[in-house]
């Protein structure tokens, strides 16, 4: 198969210009000296672009997804060919290749560890890779304001024959260097024993995600102002009385007259000394060591505050203030933009959501861009989601995978061991969260234990599930409590979390489970029985680790009760899913990474691990918990969700698919949730069902033996509270608050 290297030059990035107008396209064939270049004033440019995206050859580029989107915008009739070529696996991106090479050798995608113990940030720009592989410094050409890169828009409408020599040299150098890096990556892969499997798959996913970025989401000015007001009210000193009384929050200082002028006022600020003093007191109450920073100061980071906030009302307020403050610090500024029209910063009518297609977990991430108003679409505060609304005449079609990571875990165990309780529960038409919740309730709730005496856990599941639709609020509350507890238990323990980390995880979103509160409500009989059981040895280990005290000094403090409950929950989880012990043993024995070595603070070697994803990507340099999470949960789910994103985007944009979704526009990808903007018409139900079918079809690529469901819903604005709503004919209709 021939290989073509291609690149484009465009107008500059900016608001409304995520994939700007195409100016010129340049290309070369592998091993040939000739480099072609055509401007948008050349009548042959369309035919050349058509040849570049035609089937039958490998197409390679640096951030090739940008080039393909630019070409599709310039020549819409080429869009079907682009999608077909991507699905055929004939397009690859140097960035995806480089990341997979790093993932399969060191496992590090962000920072490389140097021999002296320091770290170096890993770059994926053409300039970064040219310097790494070729010793070629391209930084001036890429970064200088006067570089030809920034002025191709001035050549709009011209034939390439009329381009200045600097612009010709710049464009041709880019495509030549692309070839040189590509060949160097191949050599490095062979020399290092690496792998770039799934480069084409991730390139296809990257194109779909970039199409979503280009669309962006419209903002609602009224909702934005409501959010700003909510933040200001929440941060008002009147709402922070405990913080003020503790001296942690200094009040604002108003400007005052001084020497004929006015002093500069000061906003409310945090008194670090008072904060640290409260943290120390709370740590003593919680009976945990005070964590210190490298500089010897008391640590008051989010993890520490999470662990001790329950012991100090002022720290609870501080935690709430930090959460709201994050909206003020990140969400609100990212929604604003200076359009350089003399009106200053203001709410942008459209916010874009850029994506990083491949991170170390093999999942995706999202981040803001400096080039246009943008935000991290995968970590939007729920209180800010309502600012994003569908365009006039459109609605949001949301859909997420139901219990995605439990499905992938079931498939992984079934593939490895030929059996999986998760799979059995799903095939029986039951819900794993409710299934585990029933087992937890049988262990910890005496009345439920009595009412299910002699039952199988299947029957106990059915009884608990029936309470969801009970006419009695107490039954509904009971169902919600135990299914809610099962979520962090069933999703946290497969990742190998210890009890302390699990307790902190359970307390956070999306679970919000107060394990400490539940532990303190349990009767003394539970703890008497626990002390006589097999888990007491583990609890004594944590007692000594956290307090430094001997076994003889053990006392049932709230902290020890909480850890005991966490250990008990994990024990019940193991009893319901016994293959998980085999899963952990498999990781310890079959997933050892013999190529990479890590050391702890004392210089002792730490065993690292590796694994292969369902589609064949290799990930090395992992901790045990990274493999436990990645092998069974994160990587399979990520690959299936990326495949779904590609299929949905293609049907929305490729007219040859003949899909009811054609003309719709996906705008958001949030790991297991995909939000698409669709016209508000009589086919909304059909579009929703088709989207759900595509998501199920995509996940079958990685989970062929465990079925999954995708649950679509319609809403006018993004909301965490939205639910599927059906009319009398059982057709999906628009949910409203």
Show the residue positions of the predicted features.
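Catalytic phosphate/metal-binding cores of nucleic-acid and nucleotide-processing enzymes, i.e., regions
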Residues: 6, 10, 19, 185-189, ...
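Core structural elements
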Residues: 170-187, 191-219, 232-233, 271-285, ...
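Acidic, glycine-rich two-metal-ion catalytic cores of nucleic acid-processing enzymes
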Residues: 2-31, 43, 252-476, 582-673, ...
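Active-site-proximal helix-loop-helix substrate-binding element of RNase H-like nuclease domains
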Residues: 20-23, 31-189, 430-468
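Polymerase palm active-site segment centered on the conserved acidic dipeptide of motif C
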Residues: 179, 230-259, 269, 567-581, ...
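Catalytic palm subdomain of template-directed nucleic-acid polymerases
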Residues: 100-108, 211-236, 409, 489-494, ...
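Short glycine-rich phosphate-binding loop at a beta-alpha junction
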Residues: 57-65, 269, 400, 501-504, ...
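Mixed-charge, glycine-rich, non-catalytic linkers/tails in nucleic-acid processing enzymes
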Residues: 81-94, 116, 139-257, 413-427, ...
């Amino acid at each position: 198969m021939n290989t073509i290297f291609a690149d484009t030059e465009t107008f500059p990035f900016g608001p409304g210009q995520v994939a700007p107008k195409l100016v010129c396209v340049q290309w070369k064939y592998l091993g040939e000296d000739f480099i072609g270049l055509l401007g948008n004033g050349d009548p042959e440019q369309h035919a050349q672009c058509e040849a570049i995206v035609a089937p039958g050859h490998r197409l390679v580029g640096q951030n090739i997804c940008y080039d393909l989107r630019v070409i599709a915008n310039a020549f819409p009739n080429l869009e079907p060919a682009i999608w077909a070529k991507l699905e055929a696996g004939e397009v690859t991106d140097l960035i995806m290749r480089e990341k997979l090479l790093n993932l399969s050798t060191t496992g590090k995608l962000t920072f490389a560890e140097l021999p002296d113990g320091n770290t170096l940030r890993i770059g994926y720009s053409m300039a970064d890779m040219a310097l790494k592989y070729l010793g070629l410094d391209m930084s001036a050409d890429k970064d200088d304001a006067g570089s030809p890169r920034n002025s191709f828009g001035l050549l709009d409408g011209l034939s390439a024959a009329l381009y200045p020599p600097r612009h010709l040299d710049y464009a041709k150098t880019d495509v030549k260097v692309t070839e040189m890096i590509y060949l160097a990556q191949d050599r490095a892969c062979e020399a290092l024993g690496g792998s770039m499997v799934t480069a084409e798959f991730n390139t296809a996913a990257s194109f779909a995600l970039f199409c979503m970025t280009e669309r962006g989401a419209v903002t609602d000015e009224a909702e934005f102002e409501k959010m700003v007001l909510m933040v200001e009210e929440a941060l008002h000193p009147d709402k922070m009385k405990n913080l003020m009384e503790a001296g942690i929050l200094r009040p604002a200082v108003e400007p005052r007259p001084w020497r004929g002028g006015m002093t500069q006022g000061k906003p409310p600020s945090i008194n670090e000394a008072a904060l640290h003093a409260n943290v120390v007191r709370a740590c003593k109450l919680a009976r945990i060591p005070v964590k210190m920073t490298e500089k010897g100061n008391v640590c008051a980071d989010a993890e520490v505050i999470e662990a001790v906030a329950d012991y100090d009302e002022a720290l609870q307020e501080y935690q709430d203030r930090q959460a709201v403050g994050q909206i003020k610090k990140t969400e609100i500024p990212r929604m604003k933009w200076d359009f350089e029209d003399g009106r200053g910063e203001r709410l942008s009518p459209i916010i874009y959501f850029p994506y990083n297609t491949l991170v170390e977990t093999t999942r995706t991430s999202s981040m803001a861009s400096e080039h246009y108003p943008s935000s991290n679409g995968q970590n939007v505060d729920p209180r800010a989601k309502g600012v994003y609304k569908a365009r006039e005449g459109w609605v949001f079609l949301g859909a997420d995978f139901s219990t995605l990571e439990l499905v992938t875990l079931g498939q992984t165990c079934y593939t490895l061991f030929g059996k999986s309780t998760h799979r059995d529960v799903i095939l029986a038409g039951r819900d794993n969260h409710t299934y585990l919740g029933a087992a937890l309730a049988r262990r910890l709730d005496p009345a439920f234990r009595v009412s299910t005496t002699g039952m199988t856990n299947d029957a106990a599941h059915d009884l608990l599930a029936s309470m969801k639709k009970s006419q009695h609020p107490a039954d509904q509350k009971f169902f919600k409590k135990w299914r809610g507890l099962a979520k962090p238990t069933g999703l946290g323990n497969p990742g190998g979390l210890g009890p302390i980390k699990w307790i902190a995880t359970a307390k956070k979103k999306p679970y919000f489970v107060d394990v400490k509160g539940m532990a303190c409500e349990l009767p003394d009989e539970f703890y008497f029985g626990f002390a006589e059981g097999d888990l007491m040895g583990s609890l004594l280990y944590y007692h000594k680790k956290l307090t430094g005290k001997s076994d003889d000094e053990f006392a049932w403090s709230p902290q020890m009760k909480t850890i005991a409950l966490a250990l008990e929950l994990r024990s019940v989880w193991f009893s319901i899913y016994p293959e998980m012990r085999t899963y952990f043993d498999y990781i310890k024995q079959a997933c050892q990474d013999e190529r990479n070595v890590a050391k702890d603070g004392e210089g002792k070697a730490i065993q690292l691990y590796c694994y292969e994803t369902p589609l064949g990507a290799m990930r090395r340099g992992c901790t045990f918990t990274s493999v436990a999470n990645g092998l069974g949960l994160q990587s399979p789910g990520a690959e299936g969700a990326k495949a779904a994103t590609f299929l949905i985007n293609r049907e929305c944009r490729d007219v040859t698919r003949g899909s009811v979704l054609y003309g719709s526009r996906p705008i958001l990808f949030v790991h297991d949730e995909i939000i698409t903007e669709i016209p508000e018409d009589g086919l909304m139900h059909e579009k929703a069902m088709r989207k759900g079918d595509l998501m199920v079809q995509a996940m079958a690529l990685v989970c062929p033996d465990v079925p999954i469901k995708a649950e679509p819903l319609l809403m006018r604005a993004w909301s965490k509270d939205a639910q599927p709503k059906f009319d009398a004919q059982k057709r999906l209709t628009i949910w409203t608050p």
